[in-house]
């Protein structure tokens, strides 16, 4: 008699929520359907957009017969790593001037987070210290919890961030949680365009946050997925990270080029490491090299070449900034148009938070019953939390979406 399958006891895992939402949208035959769940940019025709500068650079790379398909170094394409770190830290960064910055090319922002988490679990504040508390914002991108948990951290906590009543930042709660966190705790911070709320601290609020973190010896691990994409201004979107560096912090920053280059399926990321001196950064990179070797061994070249070529060429860099601003401006327009329509309809509640938030996502404040009504009755797909992707809005569906939200809020207050 044959034994049962070795996998007979494997339970069915629940689907990843955002991808389940996309599948449900795809299978829905209703012509009115609107996808506000997708985590990617869309044009006003609801289509993906390949940036014109990316098309140009892809052709340039294809025509360069000196390039080949040999393995990249374990830590990645050197030009990409340096360009990526320079982009987030700025040309005049004291850390760059003092040669105490390193970079690790990764498989997207998630890969950068994972390499950083694996390193911290092995080497942060001692060796194999996985009992160090890791704090993530409440709410946060769901992968933050999963990545640090998979890296072996046993004490993952949340810090207060979103004030549901005022639909804005809970600064006092945030500061109190910083004050009460054990010294040397790790804090995952969103550099800009907080996901899912779209609500960021002001520069003055960031200064207060940094002051407490400095006094309490807390380690900042920034997640920068939207530089340039949030406000349309590369410098503004990196302000918090640069301020922390100017204050003498050692820190990690996970960078993603999925959104601001539109390179979603190329998986282009970088982990920027800022240390106190050159030698310590070299030692950190030597350990990260070991981690990468047993994780993906060597990163892919195409996306990194596209980013490095663009960032290192002044003309292409200028064109890219224009492309990024095109995306950011469309999102800002959709925010103001949605708010205007809801206010014109006299939809119950206040809607100013829609234009006060920035980036791809808006935390609408819609409750679960309202969301359920929108999905089931109106075929408008959004996350159960009420988070919507502003890129899913177009001049063609704005009226329908606003009217539907008005109905949902009026029916289920």
From Swiss-Prot:
<dbReference type="InterPro" id="IPR015424">
    <property type="entry name" value="PyrdxlP-dep_Trfase"/>
</dbReference>
<dbReference type="GO" id="GO:0046686">
    <property type="term" value="P:response to cadmium ion"/>
</dbReference>
<feature type="binding site">
    <location>
        <position position="387"/>
    </location>
    <ligand>
        <name>L-aspartate</name>
    </ligand>
</feature>
<dbReference type="GO" id="GO:0047801">
    <property type="term" value="F:L-cysteine transaminase activity"/>
</dbReference>
<dbReference type="GO" id="GO:0006536">
    <property type="term" value="P:glutamate metabolic process"/>
</dbReference>
<dbReference type="GO" id="GO:0032966">
    <property type="term" value="P:negative regulation of collagen biosynthetic process"/>
</dbReference>
<dbReference type="GO" id="GO:0006103">
    <property type="term" value="P:2-oxoglutarate metabolic process"/>
</dbReference>
<dbReference type="GO" id="GO:0043490">
    <property type="term" value="P:malate-aspartate shuttle"/>
</dbReference>
<dbReference type="GO" id="GO:0043648">
    <property type="term" value="P:dicarboxylic acid metabolic process"/>
</dbReference>
<dbReference type="GO" id="GO:0035902">
    <property type="term" value="P:response to immobilization stress"/>
</dbReference>
<keyword id="KW-0028">Amino-acid biosynthesis</keyword>
<dbReference type="GO" id="GO:0006532">
    <property type="term" value="P:aspartate biosynthetic process"/>
</dbReference>
<dbReference type="GO" id="GO:0031406">
    <property type="term" value="F:carboxylic acid binding"/>
</dbReference>
<dbReference type="InterPro" id="IPR015421">
    <property type="entry name" value="PyrdxlP-dep_Trfase_major"/>
</dbReference>
<dbReference type="InterPro" id="IPR000796">
    <property type="entry name" value="Asp_trans"/>
</dbReference>
<dbReference type="GO" id="GO:0051902">
    <property type="term" value="P:negative regulation of mitochondrial depolarization"/>
</dbReference>
<keyword id="KW-0963">Cytoplasm</keyword>
<dbReference type="GO" id="GO:0051384">
    <property type="term" value="P:response to glucocorticoid"/>
</dbReference>
<dbReference type="GO" id="GO:0004609">
    <property type="term" value="F:phosphatidylserine decarboxylase activity"/>
</dbReference>
<keyword id="KW-0808">Transferase</keyword>
<dbReference type="GO" id="GO:0007219">
    <property type="term" value="P:Notch signaling pathway"/>
</dbReference>
<protein>
    <recommendedName>
        <fullName>Aspartate aminotransferase, cytoplasmic</fullName>
        <ecNumber>2.6.1.1</ecNumber>
        <ecNumber>2.6.1.3</ecNumber>
    </recommendedName>
</protein>
<dbReference type="GO" id="GO:0097054">
    <property type="term" value="P:L-glutamate biosynthetic process"/>
</dbReference>
<feature type="binding site">
    <location>
        <position position="195"/>
    </location>
    <ligand>
        <name>L-aspartate</name>
    </ligand>
</feature>
<dbReference type="InterPro" id="IPR004838">
    <property type="entry name" value="NHTrfase_class1_PyrdxlP-BS"/>
</dbReference>
<dbReference type="GO" id="GO:0051481">
    <property type="term" value="P:negative regulation of cytosolic calcium ion concentration"/>
</dbReference>
<dbReference type="GO" id="GO:0006531">
    <property type="term" value="P:aspartate metabolic process"/>
</dbReference>
<dbReference type="GO" id="GO:0006533">
    <property type="term" value="P:aspartate catabolic process"/>
</dbReference>
<feature type="modified residue" description="Phosphoserine">
    <location>
        <position position="149"/>
    </location>
</feature>
<dbReference type="GO" id="GO:1990267">
    <property type="term" value="P:response to transition metal nanoparticle"/>
</dbReference>
<dbReference type="GO" id="GO:0009743">
    <property type="term" value="P:response to carbohydrate"/>
</dbReference>
<dbReference type="InterPro" id="IPR004839">
    <property type="entry name" value="Aminotransferase_I/II_large"/>
</dbReference>
<dbReference type="GO" id="GO:0005829">
    <property type="term" value="C:cytosol"/>
</dbReference>
<dbReference type="GO" id="GO:0055089">
    <property type="term" value="P:fatty acid homeostasis"/>
</dbReference>
<dbReference type="GO" id="GO:0071260">
    <property type="term" value="P:cellular response to mechanical stimulus"/>
</dbReference>
<dbReference type="GO" id="GO:0006094">
    <property type="term" value="P:gluconeogenesis"/>
</dbReference>
<keyword id="KW-0032">Aminotransferase</keyword>
<comment type="subunit">
    <text>Homodimer.</text>
</comment>
<comment type="similarity">
    <text>Belongs to the class-I pyridoxal-phosphate-dependent aminotransferase family.</text>
</comment>
<feature type="binding site">
    <location>
        <position position="39"/>
    </location>
    <ligand>
        <name>L-aspartate</name>
    </ligand>
</feature>
<dbReference type="GO" id="GO:0060290">
    <property type="term" value="P:transdifferentiation"/>
</dbReference>
<feature type="binding site">
    <location>
        <position position="141"/>
    </location>
    <ligand>
        <name>L-aspartate</name>
    </ligand>
</feature>
